[in-house]
Amino acid sequence: MKIERVIVQNFRSHKNSEIEFKPGINLIIGQNGAGKSSLLDAILVGLYWSKRMRLRGLKKDEFTRTGTRGAIIEITFEEDGTKYKVLRDFARNVSYLKRLDGREWRHVTETSMESVSSFIDRIIPYNVFLNAIYVRQGQIDAILESDETRDKIVKEILNLDKLEKAYDNLGKIRKYIKYSIEEKEKFIMKTENIEDLIRTQEKSFTEVLNEIRNISSNLPRLRRELEGIKEEVKTLEATFNSITELKLRLGELNGKKGRLEERIRQLESGIEEKRKKSKELEEVVKELPELEKKETEYRRLIEFKDEYLVKKNELEKRLGILSNRLQEVKRKIKDAESKVARIRWIEERLKEIQEKIMKLEPRVREFEDAMRLKAQMESLKSKLGGLEPEKINEKLLYLENRKKELEEEIDKITRKIGELNQRSKDRRLAIIELKKARGKCPVCGRELTEEHKADLLRKYSLELSSIEKEIQEAKALERQLRAEFRKVENELSRLSSLKTIADQIIEIRERLSKINLEDLKRDKEEYELLKSESNKLKGEVESLKKEVNELNDYKNESTKLEIEIDKAKKELSEIEDRLLRLGFKTIDELSGRIRELEKFHNKYIEAKNAEKELRDILESLKDEREELDKAFEELAKIETDIEKVTSQLNELQRKFDQKKYEEKREKMMKLSMEIKGLETKLEELERRRDEIKSTIEKLKEERKERESAKMELEKLNIAIKRIEELRGKIKEYKALIKEEALNKIGEIASEIFSEFTDGKYSGIAIRAEDNKVKLFVIYDGVERPLTFLSGGERIALGLAFRLAMSMYLIGKVDLLILDEPTPFLDEERRRKLIEIMERHLRKISQVIIVSHDEELKDAADHVIRIRLEGGASKVEVVS
């Protein structure tokens, strides 16, 4: 992979930055907090942003520039002769990856964050990029943390974790095959007596078939005998059923005869009663003609009274409503005529207010802008945690100086610990040699007496205790210094991120200092009062105009109301005239006459009811007489039928033999039960036959499976042996690859580290063990542990090892990114790093280095400077 161009917008301090990278060594220089490392983080996010990165604690809110919707990152790079362009737009949550095809860019993935990351991960895995290509700030000495950490990093770079996974998967397969072998062996043992079971079932099958044949031969004879008896019983049952039906028929006829005789008696009695009642009703009906005259007058007066009362009430109520509305309309006409002058005054006042509002509007907008700036400044201040913006630069300078002091102190104490460890080791060796010595002192060469030996041992032991005490004190001081160093670094990181915010606050404060907020506030308040008065007056004038516009409507309504009132009065007069024409002066006189006619009305009602009842009785008499005639005819017919049925019944009873009928029925039942029992037994035998047959087939199938299991067992035993061999080869191959890679990395790292230390150390030694990679330095031809190194030498070793891993990957990966590789290197080692860059890093197609160290420019092909201006990072190409 070679990175050609990076465009970053709204990413931390980068508002809108574009950088082109060239083949060779690209150096990005600038002061702390300028945005150098942020640019490298933007490359990492642009290439690999996914759920995996979010899970590792990197959040959009942390890298999105304050006051923007989201960062935008575009990276153009080349891989294996093909150009790609990746875009991450966090404001719209959009991402794409395109490939240059001729002169046209074409999509190669779906437009989603995860799809783009997956494709790039196939080109260069994320772990390889993070652990070998991109060496992040503060991680140079991470390789020296522990043997386990080194082992993990080496495995990821060499893809040994995949071989380990294959090794583990083969172990799982081996376990499964062993389980299968056990299951096959259990099955073979379980089916050991399969042949005996088959013979037993075949014998049972033959016995069942014989029973089926015996029953099948007897059933036809018994069924024929049953059919003959059934025919005889059927004939006797037909006669028996006929006798039963005739008895039922005779009972029905006698019952019907009794009911008819009872009905005839009821009809004769009812006819006599209705004849008497009809004579009584005829006497009442004779008075009906005279009563009808009185009823006609009664109805006419009642109808008029109801109409009179309803209409008079409606007219009086309507007159009241119309009169009230007329008074209200006349009042509104008077009010509307008085409001025209008020409208003219309001319109003049509104013109004056509008002129003042137009003059104040620019001042109001200026006030609102100032208040927004003030709110933004307060929001930014809250992020500073109480710090004054002007104090941040002073504190940053102090912390950078303190960081350098701590680096020097840590380097000094680390050297001291190394020297003390060596002195301690020397004293321990001297004590061991002294204990072994006989005759001659190994220290001074004099004769060694027991007393002299004891004195020397006491002396060396006291010196050793003193050295150990000094080591513990030095280590305690080192821990204290490193703890303070981490605090200083954390505070530097925090203040660097706050510097942009502080610059924005200062800029806003300068803009606000040029504005008179009190004057603007007074103008704003006057503006609001005028707007409020204007709205009230506009509402009032609209209401007044509406009322004035309705004046003609009110006048027309007044005229119509007067006409309606006259019409209602006329209708009221007409209904009073109708009362007089009927002969009554008042409604009370009319009510008195109606009360006189009510007794005739009641008699009329009684006579009309009697007339209706008489008609009903006469009609009923006619129907009952007809029904009586029909009943006599039906009774004669039923008596004839009774005689006929009685004759037929006597004839059948004479021919029917009840005893013979019962004997035949009993024999038929016994035969049916015998046949049913045989059929049931036959069904059971056939079911058993099928079960035995199925069992035999299953047993034979198990016999086949048993033979197959024996063959599979042989294959599984061969397979498990091959898996064991393959696991052994994978283990050997993994160890071989790891050893070869570590040897090569060791050679490269030895050369670089030796150059760093001017030959003080002739190289390094690497030994691989299970899940560990142990690292030693070679001093005076002897392997020494890493505790032998001073602080600066440890950093040099870490850098040498990280560079060696990247050099090893040349041919597989042609890109290296270093973020601040020199923070703990002294001047001499920084100079050596330049020589190493010239000699070794030029073997890599493209190297990107971020540093605040100006000395590195001498070794770079392309130099880019980043500085902070007005809270935003600015990019400048130096060479």
Swiss-Prot record:
One Gene Ontology term from the biological process aspect of the record: double-strand break repair
Cofactor(s) named in the record: Zn(2+)
Cofactor details (free text): Binds 1 zinc ion per homodimer.
Coiled-coil region: 241-344, 390-429, 462-727
Similarity section: Belongs to the SMC family. RAD50 subfamily.
SMART domains: AAA (SM00382)
Domain Zinc-hook residue range list: 396-493
Residues that bind ATP: 12, 32-38, 137, 788-793
Amino-acid positions noted as binding Zn(2+) in the UniProt annotation, renumbered to this chain: C441, C444
Entry annotated with the keyword Glycoprotein: no
Keywords attached to this entry: ATP-binding, Coiled coil, DNA damage, DNA repair, Hydrolase, Metal-binding, Nucleotide-binding, Zinc
A molecular function (GO) term: zinc ion binding
Recorded domain comment: The two conserved Cys that bind zinc constitute the zinc-hook, which separates the large intramolecular coiled coil regions. The 2 Cys residues coordinate one molecule of zinc with the help of the 2 Cys residues of the zinc-hook of another Rad50 molecule, thereby forming a V-shaped homodimer.
Keyword Hydrolase applies: yes
PANTHER family per record: ABC TRANSPORTER ABCH.3
Name of the protein described by the UniProt record: DNA double-strand break repair Rad50 ATPase
Subunit-level organization: Homodimer. Forms a heterotetramer composed of two Mre11 subunits and two Rad50 subunits.
Record function comment: Part of the Rad50/Mre11 complex, which is involved in the early steps of DNA double-strand break (DSB) repair. The complex may facilitate opening of the processed DNA ends to aid in the recruitment of HerA and NurA. Rad50 controls the balance between DNA end bridging and DNA resection via ATP-dependent structural rearrangements of the Rad50/Mre11 complex.
Species name: Pyrococcus horikoshii (strain ATCC 700860 / DSM 12428 / JCM 9974 / NBRC 100139 / OT-3)
PROSITE patterns membership: ZN_HOOK
